[in-house]
Amino acid sequence: MEFGVFILAQQRGYHQTSQQVIGNSIEQTVVAEQAGFNTAWYAEHHFNNYSLSPSPLMMVAHMAAKTQRIRLGTAVCILPLYQPARFLAEVGFVDTVSNGRLDLGVGSGYQEFEFERFGVKIA
């Protein structure tokens, strides 16, 4: 059996700054690795405090430098919001800097307001 942790980076109240929320996400990942968890997964959401994680690939790249063993995953990258060639280039880069620890999760997205604000039609 394997264990993972899902990092939403949720700002539960405005008493928390963005820096505190992101700092907590970083700390949770480091502690998860120390506790023997196999994977840390990072969300992608935009334009709200439900999740302050607009780029799970950036989070994986950052955490690759702060961890040694734990696998790092995207949960999920919202594919319609990306330009395909750039997305593939970034995935390749992140997999390289993480020494092959990237677990890539992709999805179609579901929050209509995120698509509207990016000027993308939701399928």
Report each predicted region and the residues it spans.
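Catalytic metal-binding/acid-base residues of hydrolase active sites
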Residues: 46, 77, 109-111
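Flexible, glycine-rich active-site loops centered on histidine and acidic residues
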Residues: 2-18, 81-123
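Amphipathic repeat-derived elements
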Residues: 64-65, 72-74, 98-103
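N-terminal beta1-alpha1-beta2 module of alpha/beta enzyme domains
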Residues: 1-72
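Structural motif
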Residues: 43, 75, 105-107
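Active-site nucleophile and cofactor-binding loops and adjacent substrate-binding regions
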Residues: 74-82
